[in-house]
Amino acid sequence: VCWVGSIIFFSFFVAPVVFKTLEREKAGELVGIIFPRYYMIGYVCGVLVLVALLLTGPETAGLKWCAWGIMMLGTVCAGLAVNPKARILKEKLKDAPETEKPDLEARFKTLHSLSVKLNATVLFAGLWLLWLTAVIFKV
């Protein structure tokens, strides 16, 4: 619940407000500062979910393992691969000559798009995990 809640809160409340309130560059810097903490929440929650799944036993875990795996894979890919690469591109953009900026911006947009897709995948897998948990408790 915390993991899914943090994704919803950041994606639908924090990020939009920051980008609406601050100029684009400052908003990007602020969100860039938040991202490592955001992904850390995912890592910690992922470990806690793993422990919970191990404690529930295989007979009740079932598809929850799949949902958890998708969530972890998406979080780890975004947090340890996509986000650092995007951060490096943002730094390069600051000092890049005007002739190089369009290429760097296009590469950043590609990484941003991938990050958004990974985030959405983690969110939907998390909702699926919550649904699976609710169905099992209902029985």
Each model region followed by its residue ranges:
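Polytopic transmembrane helical bundles with strong interfacial aromatic enrichment
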Residues: 1-139
